[in-house]
Swiss-Prot record:
This is Aspartyl/glutamyl-tRNA(Asn/Gln) amidotransferase subunit B. Keywords: ATP-binding, Ligase, Nucleotide-binding, Protein biosynthesis. GO terms for biological process: glutaminyl-tRNAGln biosynthesis via transamidation; translation. GO terms for molecular function: asparaginyl-tRNA synthase (glutamine-hydrolyzing) activity; ATP binding; glutaminyl-tRNA synthase (glutamine-hydrolyzing) activity. Heterotrimer of A, B and C subunits. InterPro entries: Asn/Gln-tRNA_amidoTrfase_suB/E, Asn/Gln-tRNA_Trfase_suB/E_cat, Asn/Gln_amidotransferase, Asn/Gln_tRNA_amidoTrase-B-like, GatB, GatB_C_1, GatB_Yqey_C_2, Gln-tRNA_amidoTrfase_suB_CS. PANTHER family: GLUTAMYL-TRNA GLN AMIDOTRANSFERASE SUBUNIT B MITOCHONDRIAL AND PROKARYOTIC PET112-RELATED (PTHR11659), GLUTAMYL-TRNA(GLN) AMIDOTRANSFERASE SUBUNIT B, MITOCHONDRIAL (PTHR11659:SF0). Allows the formation of correctly charged Asn-tRNA(Asn) or Gln-tRNA(Gln) through the transamidation of misacylated Asp-tRNA(Asn) or Glu-tRNA(Gln) in organisms which lack either or both of asparaginyl-tRNA or glutaminyl-tRNA synthetases. The reaction takes place in the presence of glutamine and ATP through an activated phospho-Asp-tRNA(Asn) or phospho-Glu-tRNA(Gln). Belongs to the GatB/GatE family. GatB subfamily. Pfam families: GatB_N, GatB_Yqey. Transmembrane segments: none annotated. Its EC number is 6.3.5.-. The keyword tRNA processing does not apply.
Length: 481
């Protein structure tokens, strides 16, 4: 039997406000445990919450960016459950009146195709604290610094059909919230966390299968692995005559498996009711107009512009627009060198490879955009070849100066004098007279393979400095003359 995977994602984005959603406590990551938890965060008797206006603004920004309707009237609700790191015994969230209604987001897949994923809603809520296990023997500690940190929970429609699509969607959300400046997207620190709702059904069946929810997956790689494992588990279970149970599961990256945590709760298990301490929030059109005017060029808009203005492929444009910093860097390189395709190749190739190897973000690049653009200019005017350019790039990354300084200091200027190249080629051919005879006696197919040998010898003789185009042209003329 052929199976179809059905996936819906719930993404929790920590909003980049300076203070918590209902108190003035700081939201700085990494502070000493329980040093950023106020009486309001702890739910002490007599304390009252005050809504953070900046959190509302950030939620509206997101809603406008996904073309969603922003609710004029917002109501906060209490979600009641017990957990050690939930000091009040309830979480202040939104249920029937979320701030952001239905919207959508277009994602780009690896083959360059695009898919539209529906977004059911996005609502504001407060984060819980954190349980600590490492420093306690036989016990758990509780750090309430995170309690009350503003979250935007983004709930997708069950439109996703594979683990790769799920990763593409999370990457698109990650890029969007960073472009908007509402979340830093740091998954390692828990700023962006993902719950994956996964089910399978026979291909062609309209009715959904029973879903399992995989909680708090915190990396793109783990999202793909967790979903693939859960899909395989469910298919094998059904084909063996079993039934999928609706439950919450946890992904263990060390064992590459999901395991059961608890039975999955329904909304009525949480006994939602309107929060009596918070009045309904009314959002006026003038406020939305102000927020809309502050929106930057969004990732999808930037990708389309890169394709339209610079003639880049959908894939290249998607990679370069994935982060605001990467897009800005690429545009600065292009502004310096005036060749978008060469700029794209170097940013996506050598530069990205260097950053990955050194574990750096683009903002920490040892090669500035102006330096890289200047080096590409030297390729364009034939001062250096592409091969020599890689040596120049490495030297720039090591802090040895600009491209021009390195070329001058190391004597890397390309040989373009046709007379000098011809003399060098004559020496190469004389030293390989036997291969020359074989070449001239061969058919076209063999000649093509042998030609690369002569080019290699010529570039070796010139220490990579001879202009490759001229070498190819003059070599062909001499071999066939």
């Amino acid at each position: 039997m052929q199976w179809e995977t059905v996936i819906g994602l719930e993404i929790h984005a920590q909003l980049s406000t300076q203070s918590k959603i209902f108190s003035g406590s700081a939201t700085t990551f990494g502070a000493e445990p329980n040093t950023q938890a106020s009486l309001v965060d702890l739910g002490m008797p007599g304390t009252l919450p005050v809504l953070n206006a900046e959190a509302v603004r950030m939620a509206c920004k997101f809603g406008l960016a996904i073309d969603a309707e922003i609710a004029e009237k917002n109501v906060f609700a209490r979600k009641n459950y017990f957990y050690p790191d939930l000091p009040k015994g309830y979480q202040t969230s939104q249920m029937d009146h979320p701030i952001v209604g239905k919207g959508h987001l277009d994602i780009t897949l690896e083959d360059g195709s695009t898919r539209r994923i529906g977004i059911t809603r996005a609502h504001l809520e407060e984060d819980a604290g954190k349980s600590l296990h490492e420093d306690f023997h036989g016990m758990s500690g509780i750090d309430l610094n995170r309690a009350g940190t503003p979250l935007l929970e983004i709930v997708s429609e069950p439109d996703i059909r594979s683990a790769k699509e799920a990763v593409a969607y999370v990457k698109a959300i990650h890029a969007l919230v960073r472009y908007l400046g509402i979340c830093d997207g740091n998954m390692a620190e828990g700023s962006l966390r993902c719950d994956c709702n996964v089910s399978v059904r026979p291909k062609g069946q309209a009715e959904f299968g029973t879903r399992a929810e995989i909680k708090n997956v915190n990396s793109f790689r783990f999202i793909e692995k967790a979903i693939n494992h859960e899909v395989q588990r469910q298919i094998e279970l059904i084909e063996d005559g079993g039934k999928v149970v609706q439950e919450t599961r946890l992904y263990d990256p060390n064992k590459d498996e999901t395991r059961s945590m608890r039975s999955k709760e329904e909304a009525n298990d949480y006994r939602y009711f309107p929060c009596p301490d918070l009045l309904p929030v009314v959002i006026e059109q003038s406020f939305l107009d102000e927020v809309r005017a502050s929106l930057p060029e969004l990732p999808g808009q930037k990708r389309e512009r890169f394709e339209r203005e610079f003639g880049l492929s959908t894939y290249d444009a998607s990679v370069l627009s994935a982060s605001r910093e990467m897009a800005d860097y690429f545009e600065q390189v292009n502004a310096t060198c005036g060749d978008a395709k060469l700029a794209a190749n170097w940013v996506m190739g050598e530069l990205s490879s260097l950053l990955n190897k050194e574990g750096l973000d683009i903002e920490q690049s040892p090669v500035t955009a102006e330096q890289l653009g200047g080096m590409i200019l030297r390729i364009k005017d034939d001062t250096i070849s592409g091969k020599i350019a890689k040596m120049v790039f490495e030297a720039m990354a090591a802090g040895e100066g600009s491209a021009d300084e390195i070329i001058e200091k190391k004597g890397l200027k390309q040989v373009t004098d046709s007379g000098a190249i011809e003399a060098m080629l004559d020496e190469v051919l004389a030293a390989n007279a036997e291969q020359v005879e074989q070449y001239r006696a061969s058919d076209e197919a063999k000649r093509g393979k042998m030609f690369g040998f002569f080019v290699g010898q010529a570039m070796k003789a010139s220490k990579g400095k001879a202009n490759p185009g001229q070498v190819n042209q003059l070599l062909k003329k001499k071999l066939e003359g």
